[in-house]
Amino acid sequence: MTIIRKTHPLMKMVNHAFIDLPAPSNISSWWNFGSLLGLCLIIQIASGLFLAMHYTSDTISAFSSVAHICRDVNYGWLIRYIHANGASLFFICLYLHIGRGIYYGSYMYKETWNVGIVLLFLTMATAFMGYILPWGQMSFWGATVITNLLSAIPYVGTSLVEWIWGGFSVDKATLTRFFAFHFILPFIIAATAMVHLLFLHETGSNNPLGIPSNSDKIPFHPYYTLKDLLGVMIILALFLTFVLFFPDLLGDPDNYSPANPLNTPPHIKPEWYFLFAYAILRSIPNKLGGVIALVLSILVLALFPLLHTANQRSMMFRPISQLLFWVLVSDLFILTWIGGQPVEPPFIIIGQIASILYFSIILVLLPVAGLIENKMLKW
């Protein structure tokens, strides 16, 4: 009898994607983050669905409804903290996944890489809108400041901001539409992730050596299903420890005060995972320039395939590029730190230097390093 997974139309798709998929035999734990991102998305959609059952998207009762979830709903506090910290886990996995892609040259699969950038933008938009929903001080002022950036667009800016707000300030209309978008976007992310996977399976996975692995493939199941399962268990253990012991560590205390349009918090800042981009935005004194730099800080990822000058795909045997990569990682940590600091000396100049270094490494130094390494290897 023919095995059902090879004949049934639906099972056949699952089989080709997760069971009989030929995978390189040498991919390391850095390749675990794709499946972990899938896990994060499932956790966020599941916990978000239960939160949405009790949440009210109204300016008068939004803050109270979140308090009600934490106090009165069975395990509501747990669901709320899983969802809030799940976003942080999502971005940790996301940034590690992107870092892996840069280090090992996975960006040479252009379609997969570009769909990944779209996924990053969608995830950032979803996280931003989710942060507005509890309607605390930082929610309200974060929404006001970030949406206001669109007013820097010449000619249509102001109209665009008022159109997004649904009025002349962030109010009930804004909260309601943000809730609607925050609910629908994760499903769009899930669909886009399927496209991401589709393009990846057209070419097959990259590997740490950055060389074709057609001569040495192994089936995805049981080898990588078990390997992914180990990653899932480790991440879940760390995540639940964090949620149960330090649930408020990454949150802003200001968000425990209800939104008040008449009282501006001394330091308006987004969640930690946006701080690097926020620091780049603030490092330029001009509003429009800052917005352009903010968008480019993410869009610059799309240039990686075009700026790849090295004859080797992976950085595994390219010491200069390796050094620059880790300087870039350190630079991102510095930008994240600066994004959470007030706008005053010496933080201003540190942020500006770190922002210039960020773009310099990606646009100039890495391509030049690739050319130098070609010369060193006489390629």
Swiss-Prot record:
Membrane topology: Multi-pass membrane protein
Co-factor(s): heme b
Protein's UniProt keywords contain DNA-binding: no
Chain residues that bind heme b b566: H97, H196
GO CC field: mitochondrial inner membrane; respiratory chain complex III
Cofactor mode of binding and number, as noted: Binds 2 heme b groups non-covalently.
Pfam families reported in the protein's UniProt record: Cytochrom_B_C, Cytochrome_B
Main subcellular location: mitochondrion
GO terms for biological process, alphabetical: mitochondrial electron transport, ubiquinol to cytochrome c
UniProt-annotated binding residues for a ubiquinone: H201
Record key words, sorted: Electron transport, Heme, Iron, Membrane, Metal-binding, Mitochondrion, Mitochondrion inner membrane, Respiratory chain, Transmembrane, Transmembrane helix, Transport, Ubiquinone
CDD domains: cytochrome_b_C, Cytochrome_b_N
Localization, UniProt: Mitochondrion inner membrane
Transmembrane intervals: 33-53, 77-98, 113-133, 178-198, 226-246, 288-308, 320-340, 347-367
SUPFAM superfamilies the record matches: a domain/subunit of cytochrome bc1 complex (Ubiquinol-cytochrome c reductase), Transmembrane di-heme cytochromes
InterPro entries reported in the protein's UniProt record: Cyt_b/b6_C, Cyt_b/b6_C_sf, Cyt_b/b6_N, Cytb/b6-like_sf, Cytochrome_b, Cytochrome_b_C_euk/bac, Cytochrome_b_N_euk/bac, Di-haem_cyt_TM
MF GO annotations: metal ion binding; ubiquinol-cytochrome-c reductase activity
Functional summary from the UniProt entry: Component of the ubiquinol-cytochrome c reductase complex (complex III or cytochrome b-c1 complex) that is part of the mitochondrial respiratory chain. The b-c1 complex mediates electron transfer from ubiquinol to cytochrome c. Contributes to the generation of a proton gradient across the mitochondrial membrane that is then used for ATP synthesis.
Additional remark text: Heme 1 (or BL or b562) is low-potential and absorbs at about 562 nm, and heme 2 (or BH or b566) is high-potential and absorbs at about 566 nm.
PANTHER family in the cross-refs: CYTOCHROME B
Subunit field text: The cytochrome bc1 complex contains 11 subunits: 3 respiratory subunits (MT-CYB, CYC1 and UQCRFS1), 2 core proteins (UQCRC1 and UQCRC2) and 6 low-molecular weight proteins (UQCRH/QCR6, UQCRB/QCR7, UQCRQ/QCR8, UQCR10/QCR9, UQCR11/QCR10 and a cleavage product of UQCRFS1). This cytochrome bc1 complex then forms a dimer.
Protein's name according to its UniProt entry: Cytochrome b
Organism the protein comes from: Chaetodipus intermedius
Name of the gene: MT-CYB
